[in-house]
Amino acid sequence: CIRDSEKNMKNIKKGVLPILCVLFFVFGLIMLQPDFGTGMIIVISIIGLLFVGGVSMKFFIGLGIIGVLGITGLIIIAPYRLARILSFLNPWSDPLGSGFQIIQSLYAIGPGGLFGFGFLNSRQKHFYLPEPQTDFIFSIISEEFGFLGIVIVVTLFLTIIITGFKISKNCKDLFGKYLSFGIMFQLSFQALLNLMVVVGLIPVTGVTLPFLSYGGSSLLITCLLYTSPSPRDISGS
């Protein structure tokens, strides 16, 4: 029962530990792929739900220390992750290798100007920027539609996110509240992660941009996730 779980959130052993066990199991399966970006989205989303559920700050401090050590270990055992971090700090140190994607992404965003080159007139998507239809779709949008396109995309995402959190706030039952908050936290964090990657603020993660990146099944699941809290907001059942 969600209400009983909320009462137990102050008790790490009864309320939080079972959730963490399931989380670490799922995270471990994802890392076997390996897919570090998706794993981090799930972990951060669950941590956000625990915070809303009323878990004490001492727990988050301890979890943060463990998380830093764990991420450090994952970076050490997988050299390509370290290469991504180093290329993020200085992509020009390896412009034809680990820094290639970031450099080509910036080449796409920079020349777009105010209005861009026009629809389907991108140059970087023609064998310059890898995965322009998935991870780096925002770079192509920036190149073809310029700063105006960037503003429109960011505004649409902010509208979706704000609306989703309003639904969470207005939910009449705890399950609907946690469901809508978790979904919107996941979508907003994934979008933020992707946008930060394409502008070179964080290392490449391989995370796609919700609603816009290529993939029919991904789009279908994202739309289903976003619409699922709405009936609960209306009926409270």
Spans of model-derived segments:
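Single conserved hydrophobic/aromatic residue that forms the stacking wall/gate
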Residues: 1-2, 226-237
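Hydrophobic alpha-helical transmembrane segments of multi-pass inner membrane proteins, especially
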Residues: 3-101, 139-200
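Residue-level marker of motif borders
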Residues: 29-30, 111, 201, 208
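Hydrophobic aliphatic residues
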Residues: 89, 109, 223-224
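Long extracytoplasmic/lumenal interhelical loops at the membrane interface
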Residues: 109, 113-148, 171
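Transmembrane alpha-helices of multi-pass inner-membrane enzymes
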Residues: 202-228
